[in-house]
């Protein structure tokens, strides 16, 4: 008689869903007010001119224009700005 014993249990087999973080609009791209520029955890990028910061640190455009990434300040922080054309 062919019998199959019970399979052993495992503690693996689960993973969290990806959060789709990162830069959504790159330098030189044209954006409209309200467009999301960066989704991030913490302030990897800081808001510059015409850019707002949401409670989850999402950066978004507050006016129409072109996206500009720049590094400035004594701590070499990365800033995202929207320059009006």
UniProtKB/Swiss-Prot annotation:
Location of the region described as Disordered in the Swiss-Prot/TrEMBL record: 1-23
Alphabetized UniProt keyword annotations: Ribonucleoprotein, Ribosomal protein
GO biological process, alphabetically ordered: translation
Entry-linked InterPro entries: Ribosomal_bL27, Ribosomal_bL27_CS
Taxonomy, superkingdom: Bacteria
GO cellular component annotations of the record: cytosolic large ribosomal subunit
Keyword Ion transport: no
GO molecular function: structural constituent of ribosome
Ribosomal protein as UniProt keyword: yes
Record PANTHER family: LARGE RIBOSOMAL SUBUNIT PROTEIN BL27M (PTHR15893:SF0), RIBOSOMAL PROTEIN L27 (PTHR15893)
Family the entry assigns: Belongs to the bacterial ribosomal protein bL27 family.
Protein name (database record): Large ribosomal subunit protein bL27
Species this protein is from: Thioalkalivibrio sulfidiphilus (strain HL-EbGR7)
Taxonomic lineage: Bacteria, Pseudomonadati, Pseudomonadota, Gammaproteobacteria, Chromatiales
